[in-house]
Amino acid sequence: MTVHGNTKTSPMVTLLAGGVSGVIAKSTIAPLERVKILYQVKSKMYSFNSVYGLMKNIIKNEGLAGLWKGNTATILRIFPYSAIQWTSYDYLKNNFVTDKKSSVQIFIAGSLGFSCAILLTYPLDVIRARLALSYSNNNNNNSINSKNLNSSTQPPKVLKNGIGAVNIEKSIDFNGYKTKGLFKGIWRGILPTLYGSIPYAGVGYSSFEYFKRIAPDSFRNEKGDVIGIYKLISGGVAGGLGQTAAYPLDVVRRRIQTTGYGDGKGVENLKHSTLKTMFTIFQKEGIYALFKGISINYIKVIPTNGVAFLTYETLCDYFNSKLNKN
């Protein structure tokens, strides 16, 4: 049993609340996530006007569902991922953290819980990235501005679930698994992902707990609990801090995951270690490339993390109240 507030919460509740909160949060910002992935694997700079143009042309070429291409794979991954993440974090926090006010201990619990979720669900993240990268005009040019999306090429049929008529088997890369080994197939990019999970989850969880701890009375109810709007905002800010700390590793991860897929075929193969890949990107494209897409990422961080933190705690409170009545 874990403890949520002053109420004991069973692992089944944390699993369900964690999974549902992740699905709701990720589905809300799926269009921005797809655009971010497209920019991360390109060498061209962008502006908010080009982001708008890219989204408009995706809708034109693939329909509105094109903005959610890859979201079905995201949902299949995010439910178990978020469920494991929250349950692992709660278990570690309530069984191994001796001082709930210790940001260092919360940092470690958050990082370990996040890493557990990554290890168990990583292949689905690779598939999602490759599906999102595949978009309708098969243009090998590295530029992704709106002009290059205005193609006369007949766009592929987009399925109702938003994935698009793509070769799922190719995205999974069974042949790569057989011929290249575990870490070069569907596990490509796992190491930078794990490296990035340490600052991302550690900073995110420790910041959120700190913000809740220092919440003024004006943001607490009569029971002394932090109110929803404060959780929403503090969760978003905490997520933004974590993303900033981990973002260069996220860019490296996406480059490694998508090398040779979709429009990523035009990008130089990155088969080195994480640090060498990061240095290669920095050397060829500059420091900006390691933070490519971070501004659009900030736009989605507040709703994603805010909704996730708020939804998770709200669902835990709801399920606990129902169980206590029985």
UniProtKB/Swiss-Prot annotation:
This is Mitochondrial substrate carrier family protein R. The keyword Transport applies. Solcar repeats lie at residues 9-95, 101-214, 226-318. It is found in: Mitochondrion inner membrane. GO terms for cellular component: mitochondrial inner membrane. InterPro entries: Mit_carrier (IPR002067), Mitochondrial_sb/sol_carrier (IPR018108), Mt_carrier_dom_sf (IPR023395). Keywords: Membrane, Mitochondrion, Mitochondrion inner membrane, Repeat, Transmembrane, Transmembrane helix, Transport. The chain crosses the membrane at residues 12-32, 64-84, 104-124, 185-205, 226-246, 290-310. One of its GO terms (biological process) is mitochondrial coenzyme A transmembrane transport. One of its GO terms (molecular function) is coenzyme A transmembrane transporter activity. It comes from Dictyostelium discoideum. Belongs to the mitochondrial carrier (TC 2.A.29) family. It is a multi-pass membrane protein. Mitochondrial solute carriers shuttle metabolites, nucleotides, and cofactors through the mitochondrial inner membrane. May be involved in the accumulation of coenzyme A in the mitochondrial matrix. The keyword Repeat applies.
